[in-house]
């Protein structure tokens, strides 16, 4: 796997001046003042994170994918949609974890309005009222559509760049949701339960990490199906 990681540029870290102290043991060295990540450790971290995700999937538990940086948005969205799990790939809505009951009520409201709209039940209202409902649906969908199938807090959150997603990591810690994260050399690993230290700003490196998480989740789902057959 080291060759694959090397091929996608996973070993490239940030400049020496940007390297976080918590990353010291994961950096092989510096070349032209740029951190070179120790990929042997990255392999072990990937295996540990994959085993964790696989176990959750086998137990039928749901994960949440988060990647709001430009390089990660499409990758995260496509991966989540392929697994039919919730995701955030534009902007984290503060309180999604720590104020979950309120967020859940807004998701329920979105479903209620869309259901009434689809059944034509909103047509009994005035045009002005219908316009207000339409605007409310659009506003709710903007932030909550990708979370529409989330009925409770996830069993884990998979994050791209825990420095950029510091609020997500902080909220997860407060509600005891384990964090799996692809973390570059500038990241603080505090609050990250399953760190995978590698290039978190390169599309190919991000894709590799996300693919491994998807692969692990699907393997866990397959394990669950096989267990049912043999039970």
Short names for language-model regions:
Residues 1-231:
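Ribosome large-subunit tunnel/peptidyl-transferase-proximal elements
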């Amino acid at each position: 796997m080291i060759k694959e990681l090397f091929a996608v540029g996973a070993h490239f870290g940030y400049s020496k001046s940007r390297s976080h102290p918590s990353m010291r043991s994961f950096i092989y060295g510096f070349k032209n003042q740029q951190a070179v990540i120790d990929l042997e450790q990255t392999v072990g971290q990937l295996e540990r994170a994959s085993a964790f995700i696989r176990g959750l999937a086998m137990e039928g538990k749901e994960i949440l994918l988060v990647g709001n940086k430009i390089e990660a948005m499409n990758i995260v969205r496509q991966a989540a949609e392929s697994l039919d799990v919730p995701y955030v790939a534009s902007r984290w809505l503060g309180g999604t974890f720590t104020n979950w009951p309120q967020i859940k009520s807004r998701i329920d409201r979105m479903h209620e309005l869309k259901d009434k709209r689809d059944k034509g039940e909103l047509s009994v209202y005035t045009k002005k009222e219908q316009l207000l409902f339409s605007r409310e649906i659009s506003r709710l969908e903007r932030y909550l559509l990708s979370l529409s199938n989330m009925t409770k807090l996830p069993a884990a959150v998979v994050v791209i760049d825990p420095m950029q997603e510091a609020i997500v990591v902080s909220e997860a810690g407060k509600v005891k949701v384990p964090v799996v994260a692809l973390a570059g050399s500038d990241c603080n690993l505090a609050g990250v339960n399953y760190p995978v230290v590698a290039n978190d700003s390169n599309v190919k490196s991000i894709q590799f990490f996300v693919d491994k998480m998807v692969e692990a989740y699907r393997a866990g789902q397959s394990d669950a199906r096989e267990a049912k057959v043999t039970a």
